[in-house]
Regions:
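Short, surface-exposed ligand-recognition loops at beta-strand->loop->(often short) alpha-helix junctions
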Residues: 11-20
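Glycine-rich beta-strand-turn "strand-cap" elements at beta-sheet edges
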Residues: 2, 41-50, 76-105
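An amphipathic, aromatic/His-enriched active-site/gating alpha helix that lines ligand/cofactor pockets
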Residues: 26-38, 57-92
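Short, well-ordered beta-strand segments in beta-rich or mixed alpha/beta enzyme
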Residues: 4-11, 41-68
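Short, flexible segments with low predicted structural confidence
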Residues: 2-4, 18, 35-36
Length: 105
């Protein structure tokens, strides 16, 4: 069964990469038990720590969309928005076929 994937980069204002990464890691903890969450990774560029990447895998797009209703998630989004260097770009939406590290795919 295919899954819904989302992969995107967030560019933050100078020096705020670590702070945004911490906010996103907290978001990953909140959604880790949400229905359909298979993977929520937060990464930083080695050469540019103010570029933060998020990779998500969900059972469905609906599960991803519903994760925004998890208590605390909207508050974290509100904390993150002022750190961004502009409006976030739309991430890449992917059909995840499977692979190492994704159980039950």
């Amino acid at each position: 069964m295919n899954r819904y994937g989302l992969h995107g980069k967030l560019q933050v204002t100078a020096g705020n990469g670590p702070q945004l990464a911490q906010i996103l890691l907290e978001a990953s903890r909140l959604v880790s038990t949400a229905k359909g969450c298979r993977l929520y990774l937060v990464s930083q560029e080695d050469t540019s720590p103010d570029e933060v990447w998020v990779t998500e895998v969900w059972d469905s797009k609906e599960d991803h969309d519903n994760s925004l209703q998890v208590p605390g998630v909207k508050e974290l989004i509100s904390q993150a928005m002022p750190l961004l260097a502009g409006r976030p770009e739309k991430g890449q939406e992917l059909t995840v076929l499977g692979g190492a590290g994704l159980s039950n795919l």
